[in-house]
Swiss-Prot record:
Binds 1 zinc ion. The gene is ybeY. Coiled coil: none annotated. Its cofactor is Zn(2+). InterPro entries: MetalPrtase_cat_dom_sf_prd, YbeY, YbeY_CS. Single strand-specific metallo-endoribonuclease involved in late-stage 70S ribosome quality control and in maturation of the 3' terminus of the 16S rRNA. This is Endoribonuclease YbeY. Belongs to the endoribonuclease YbeY family.
Length: 157
């Protein structure tokens, strides 16, 4: 039986309108058991200032971002289910959902799925990796009942 342990930290000045802890749990449970039976993840919801500071410190990018992934790397002789931390910026997620004409809850789900795949070692640095990661994300999002996250909901195609 698979188990996903979530440590949800809300560090936003305004927590009104955020997805529920149950939402975050459901999204993680759609991803992590596909790869390992027991997983522990911290999700920290932050405002733009914290996202900006972390993005500058760890990625050298002078702006806030939607999701940052910090994988936990234990020494090889120690087996721990701790995957790492996801830092998700509320304002960036909300702004992107509007700009990309996506349902807000679907975009939140996509950020959790996307960030979780990064914790599992997936990346999108080159085209082949990006294509593989996007296919996995799209399949998981469909399983959750959401549309393809790489197509705008109002896209005429």
């Amino acid at each position: 039986m698979s188990q996903v342990i979530l440590d949800l930290q809300i560090a936003c000045a305004d927590s009104q309108g955020l997805p529920t802890e149950g939402d975050f749990q459901r999204w993680l449970e759609a991803v992590l058991p596909l790869f390992q039976p027991v997983s522990e993840v911290t999700i920290r919801l932050v405002d733009e200032a914290e996202s900006h500071d972390l993005n500058l410190t760890y990625r050298g990018k002078d702006k806030s971002t939607n999701v940052l992934s910090f994988p936990f790397e234990a020494p090889p002789e120690i087996e721990l289910p701790l995957l790492g931390d996801l830092i998700i910026c509320r304002q960036v997620v909300e702004k992107e959902a509007i700009e990309q004409e996506k349902a807000l809850l679907a975009h939140w789900a996509h950020m959790v799925v996307h960030g979780s795949l990064h914790l599992l070692g997936y990346d999108h640095i080159d085209d082949d990796e990006a294509e593989e990661m996007e296919l996995i994300e799209t399949e998981i999002m469909h399983g959750l009942g959401y549309p393809d996250p790489y197509i705008s909901e109002k896209d005429p195609d």
